[in-house]
């Protein structure tokens, strides 16, 4: 029996004239995530991540996004940073922020506008006393200049979760709610 872990959601919009996507170069996505892990670490093991990518070619996976990753350094927080995918390989293109906002009710917003990639993540869930003492960011705001030409024609969305199911087949999962995409 072959065991797999992780999941990918790929969305490529219709480019029919009535949709208007062929003339709209800017894009944003907003979603809500509920990780099953409640301490802020988001995933079962270090190295597991969630990428929320826009302006993506869903065949080659070239595009831009936000990476939310569990690291070995923290058991109650994740790191977030902007990435660029080139042929399925991601590279960091911004500073890294350690945050405790990847818990129930985490809102994730990623936007590309005129060559600027921006992302925000936040929650209304209060941090623990320990998280406050450690000085983790309550929310994240990141920006990177990525240029107007590279990936300009791409209109796809990629959501990539590399985590495992965990015990009872759900304890390491992340529920996604209300994914909305805007082209402008």
Where are these regions (language model features)?
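Acidic Ser/Thr/Pro-rich low-complexity disordered segments
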Residues: 59-72, 91, 125-142
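Carbohydrate-binding surfaces in secreted/extracellular proteins
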Residues: 29, 100-144
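Short, aromatic/His-centered strand-loop micro-motif at the edge of beta-sheets
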Residues: 84-109
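Predominantly extracellular/luminal cell-surface or secreted proteins
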Residues: 53-57, 83-85, 120-124, 184
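Residues within well-ordered beta-strands of beta-sheet-rich folds
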Residues: 26-34, 51-53, 65-67, 107-113, ...
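Beta-strand elements of well-folded, non-transmembrane domains
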Residues: 33-37, 58, 86, 112-114, ...
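Secretory/extracellular carbohydrate-interaction modules
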Residues: 2-81
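Ligand-recognition surfaces built from glycine- and aromatic
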Residues: 24-26, 131-132, 137-184
